[in-house]
Amino acid sequence: MTLNSLPVWPALQAHYEEIRDAHLRDWFAPANDRAPTRAERFTFEGGGLAADFSKNRLTDATLALLVRLAREAGVEARRDAMFAGETVNPTEGRAALHTALRANAPDAPFQAQVAAERAKMARFADAVRSGAWTGYTGKRIRHVVNIGIGGSDLGPKMVVHALHHVATPDIATHFVSNVDGADLARVLERIDPEATLAIIVSKTFTTLETMTNARSLRDWFVANGCPEGALAKHFVGVSANPAEVVKFGIAEANVFEMWDWVGGRYSLWSAVGLSIMIAIGPERFDELLAGARDMDEHFRTAPLERNLPVLQGLVGIWYRNFFGAQSYLVAPYSEALHYLPSYLQQLEMESNGKSARIDGAFVDYPTSAVTWGEPGTNGQHAFFQMLHQGPTLVPIDFIAVLTPEHPLASHHPKLLANCFAQSEALMLGRTLDEARKIVGPAKPELAPHLTFPGNRPTTTLLVDALTPRTLGALIALYEHKVLVQAAVWNINPFDQWGVELGKILGKVVEADLTAAQVDPAKHDSSTSALIARARKALGE
């Protein structure tokens, strides 16, 4: 199946040509905005969230055609296959059952394993939080260091930061991912070896960055007085390869299992989220799972026409495959969601940044857009200039939390006002005539610089309050959006072969950086020159 061979495709193309030059401000004009208003017609709810799609460049007819596209592309079948535990990752011969981690239903796949591992996590988290689990000198654990990269870092870091307001104040959580030693060194400056617990997270337990940092941290513990035999009080491992964890030196009792039917970027709901559970406690971790489960149920049961993940995915395809948008922006107006854009970068681009269809043929249409973002209002003082007046179309997801999670409540109306005003300004713009009235006859040459084209599409997601439950729903919303788009593009969102070639060549280059001699013909001339310069700087 190719996207442009679907029966609905010509109708979508014709519809795009029909409305491509229409302006959103005209669709919001009083004559066109009768009851029910455009906002009422294009605002939908699910999983405890609300999404206002009304400031997007689409009509009722657009949505109807896009929903037809979803049906013809088999979105429902792909969704149902994923929930049923079928092999939806054919290149690796695996299921993708991150939803089973929060299913809480006896007939869901792997529920006995999931429940047993979560109970083990809860016992351990309670022991650390209560002080029953101590360091080798008997000190309470005051620092948790999570060492992982990609899905073993981005998800837990994002959630722990987002839920800081409900986390224990007695334990500081640190995250180390980069193989650049500066990342670990900065954490080592802030922690106490007698009161620190390290969580090493790697599906294979062979990941270069993770194991390099883990070995350096182990050496630091020993150098700072921890006997080799007492390291078990300070190290636990999370992996799908328990034998390799034990080989590293972590006690078998301190190994938490993840499974190959959960992809790394979908794994925060598993033992990969142990740092989350220690920070917020098992009960709140269960609430996080419950929120994701709310969105799972909405995704499974809501009609496509009112299904938030489906609509989000289809709107993204509308801009990517018809308007030619090359990127989209995530702008959470919540400092608590500071790391959400980084998390979504991996979730979206590692999942759907593919050129090969499931059947092995190459696509002849764009797939994943570049995902980027920054919390509001910071972004307004950095790149919003380009969004308002630049020639490039960048669709935006605004995320607004309606009640603050902090005591400085007087700040919150200002924050929300900025979020809503930006979406309005991006939609309305300012015409040249309006600009001329502002500058008056004194400086007519300034008027073009004060014009805004408007017609810039935005979706606003509303969260009543940032709780573990609403955060779980928000994360699951984006997970399922990715699946919807993958189904339409007919690609596999659950593998990531694109990261492999660089890893293979990286090992070769690393060996050449320290080898006694290097054959200059081994690499292209650019890479050889880079290696030569680095060898000189390293003293080789």
UniProtKB/Swiss-Prot annotation:
Record localization: Cytoplasm
One MF term in the entry's GO annotations: monosaccharide binding
Major localization class: cytoplasm
Pfam families according to UniProt: PGI
Gene Ontology CC terms, in alphabetical order: cytosol
Catalysed reactions listed for this entry: alpha-D-glucose 6-phosphate = beta-D-fructose 6-phosphate
Catalytic residues as annotated in Swiss-Prot or TrEMBL: 350 (proton donor), 381, 503
Top-level enzyme category: isomerase
Keywords, sorted A to Z: Cytoplasm, Gluconeogenesis, Glycolysis, Isomerase
HAMAP family: G6P_isomerase
NCBIfam families: PRK00179.1
Protein name stated in the entry: Glucose-6-phosphate isomerase
